Regions:
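Catalytic cores of nucleic-acid editing and processing enzymes
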Residues: 1-277
């Protein structure tokens, strides 16, 4: 949801926060932090004070009453608690984008990476890139088939090696087909009005990782494109317990990740004309 601001913070950084190489035009495009770090720190403080992801909807937000009613109906549900990020989840990336409407109104949009305790969409936060109902339907149908293979494999005796190998091979093929079908639901756009499937956009010497296009930056940039907003700055920070690899710490800012974001952000930022090299 777009949250309008009365005025924009004076704090500003030209450092690139989100960037990537665009194979279509042969340039690296980037989006700076701008004033987004200020609003990210504000978000961090609000979450620490509230204790959950169900932040009150500020005045001036379109559809405020309906949105607030949705949040009120979820109040008290432990799945939205910030405690989740200090436990088994080992933290999560959150992001804020400063942007403006076509009429010049400046505001912010907030996002969380991936799922929050298996929840893809929380009122007040940027939705996922893919069509969520369609994604859930495809995933449920495909997972059912994969699970049926697993059940058959588990029921076989150890000496039935040839059949076991065949079923495992078929299960692996089904899993790959399901992932391909799910990836096909991710349609990415840029600021030239072009749209392409995720697999056509992604470029890297490494394979495409699970969760590509689910991080904060792609979510926020996609939301801006779908709602005709002009991004001015972006900031992503880590919330919660330090991750296992000790590369993320609570409250620290991090640029868009090299593995999943940079291979698609070049295309997504093409046409924005903040910085191109």
């Amino acid at each position: 949801v777009f949250i309008p601001l009365d005025s924009c913070a004076e704090e500003f950084s030209e450092d690139a926060a989100a960037f990537g190489y665009c194979t279509a035009c042969g340039k690296t495009h980037s989006l700076p932090y701008g004033s987004a770090q200020y609003y990210a720190r504000t978000l961090l403080a609000e979450l620490e004070a509230k204790g959950d992801m169900l932040l009150a909807v500020p005045e001036g937000v379109e559809g405020r009453q309906e949105l607030q009613a949705q949040l009120d109906s979820l109040e008290g549900n432990p799945r939205y608690s910030m405690d989740y990020l200090w436990g088994k989840a080992l933290g999560q990336m959150l992001g804020v984008m400063v942007c403006k409407k076509q009429d010049g109104t400046v505001g912010i949009v907030r996002a969380f990476s991936g799922q929050y305790d298996r929840i893809y969409d929380i009122p007040g936060w940027a939705p996922p890139v893919m069509n969520l109902p369609r994604y859930n339907a495809v995933n449920a149908a495909g997972s059912k088939v994969v699970n049926e293979y697993s059940d058959r494999i588990d029921s076989l005796a150890a000496h039935e090696k040839e059949l076991l190998q065949q079923l495992k091979k078929e299960r692996k093929a089904c899993s790959r087909a399901l992932m391909d079908e799910l990836y096909a639901l991710y349609i990415l756009g840029n600021f030239k009005g072009e749209k392409k499937p995720l697999k056509e956009v992604f470029h890297s010497t490494q394979g495409m990782r699970t969760g590509t296009a689910d991080c904060c930056a792609p979510k926020l940039i996609h939301y801006a494109q779908e709602n005709r907003l002009i991004p001015l700055g972006i900031a992503e920070f880590f919330y919660g317990a330090e991750n296992k690899s000790q590369t993320r710490q609570h409250g620290k800012f991090y640029e868009a990740c090299e593995e999943k974001c940079q291979p698609i952000l070049g295309f997504m930022l093409c046409g924005l004309d903040h910085n191109s090299e």
